[in-house]
Regions:
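Protein kinase glycine-rich loop
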Residues: 21-27, 32
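Conserved N-lobe beta3->alphaC-helix segment of eukaryotic protein kinase catalytic domains
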Residues: 43, 48-72
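Short beta-strand micro-motifs within the conserved protein kinase catalytic domain, predominantly
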Residues: 78-88
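Conserved short submotifs of the Hanks-type protein kinase catalytic core
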Residues: 88-102
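Activation segment signature within eukaryotic-like protein kinase domains
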Residues: 122-123
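Conserved catalytic-loop aspartate of Hanks-type protein kinases
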Residues: 197
């Protein structure tokens, strides 16, 4: 019996139902394809996961979230099914397809920094999604621009629920998330709540307006230390932005999570009142379609080279990981990335090679990878370095 039998949409082979068209994302344990339904000709994204025994937990976690959501909310990525391919021992997760990818890749591709009306509209969409998640007692725990996907109808949708959790099941001893966007209370293992997502949203705004998250010049573990020692409380260049935007970000980044506003309160903020009509994002997409698709076509010519470069980098990162079950290690030093379920994932220093591990160093790959949606979510029990910094979905 397959571990996933109770979760499958049907036991039909996915090869009988879908034709894979194009590779759009790569991870160490999964690949994402643009695919077409053989029956309806509808386009989907299909996440094909291998090493499924090792990755059981995050896969099931995401599936359970999607089952809870039932595609009820327009600001959450839609889920259409899960299938098992026996020949390859792979799980196929059928998801909504996003031609334009995540919001940061899209903006980078068209070389556009959002004005405050567009930014307010983007963030309002994210808040609508978070309002729904939090109403279901779900904490996302990985809010960042790479997990905010831009749909053709002009909505921002939240994706990637591999480490999401019911707020009643939180174990504060687990440090989970993407380091640059991680809230102080998660890092210090406080009894955090859904307002950790609000902090990550504040960092996401910082990323969208500044081009990168705070402390991105440092390796992830060092950045986590700095988040605690010298918390980010505002945008880097406040004088460039309105009072409303600066105030909104400061509220999100309040170090005391009990003092942070909740989603409903943020939706009433003056900055969000700057958001445009429901057609604003759709019109923005249409105005930039020509430039976007020219950039996309240019990228496609180098797709194979990009895949090889990514796999080399990912292989290097994975080869420098060591599992450590010593729960007494409390200090976040230069090596520790994340703790989860009694496992400690450690990035080992390698003096013979330069480790490309900080956000800014990784950005040099972004011109090649701008169209790839890196969607894997590494469970710390997989002994794999979390490559979220490579522009994942």
């Amino acid at each position: 019996m397959n571990l996933f039998d109770n979760y499958l949409t049907s036991k039909t082979s996915p090869l009988d139902l879908f034709q894979l068209l194009e590779l759009i994302g790569i991870g160490s344990t999964c690949k994402v394809y643009k695919a077409i339904s053989k029956k309806t000709n509808k386009i989907y994204s299909i996440k094909i996961c291998n090493e499924i025994e090792k990755n059981y937990e995050p896969i099931i976690n995401e599936i359970n979230c999607f089952r809870l959501f039932k595609n009820e909310n327009s600001y959450i990525v839609k889920f259409y099914g899960i299938y098992y391919l026996k020949n390859d021992n792979t799980i196929w997760i059928i998801l909504e397809y996003f031609e334009y990818g995540n919001i940061i890749s899209y903006l980078n591709k068209i070389n556009y920094k959002p004005d405050e009306e567009l930014l307010a509209t983007i963030i309002q969409n994210v808040l609508f999604g978070l309002l729904y998640l939090h109403s279901k007692n779900i904490i996302h725990r990985d809010i960042k621009s790479q997990n905010l996907l831009l749909s053709s109808e002009g909505r921002i949708k939240i994706s990637d629920f591999g480490i999401s959790i019911n707020k009643n099941n939180i174990n504060p001893n687990n440090i989970v998330g993407s380091p640059y966007w991680m809230s102080p209370e998660v890092i210090i293992r406080d009894n955090y709540n859904e307002k950790t997502d609000i902090y990550s949203l504040g960092i996401t705004i910082y990323e969208l307006v500044e081009g990168f998250p705070p402390y991105s010049e440092f390796k992830p573990a060092i950045a986590m230390k700095k988040i605690i020692q010298n918390p980010i409380k505002s945008l880097k260049n406040e004088n460039k932005y309105s009072k409303e935007l600066n105030d909104f970000v400061k509220l999100c980044l309040n170090v005391d999570f009990n003092e942070r506003p909740n989603v409903s309160q943020l939706l009433e903020h003056k900055f969000i009142k700057k958001s445009g009509s429901v057609k604003l994002l759709k019109n923005f997409i249409e105005e930039n379609n020509c430039y976007f698709f020219n950039q996309k076509n240019s990228f496609s010519e180098n797709n194979k080279n990009c895949e090889n470069e990514y796999m080399e980098l990912n292989s290097y990162c994975n080869n420098n990981i060591e599992n450590n079950n010593n729960n007494e290690e409390e200090e976040i030093n230069d090596s520790v990335i994340v703790h989860d379920d009694d496992n400690t994932v450690i990035v080992k220093e390698n003096n013979s090679k330069k480790q490309i591990l900080n956000y800014k160093e990784i950005l040099k790959y972004d011109s090649n990878y701008s169209n790839l949606e890196f969607v894997e979510h590494e469970s710390t029990s997989n002994l794999s370095y979390n490559t979220d910094f490579l522009n994942p979905h």
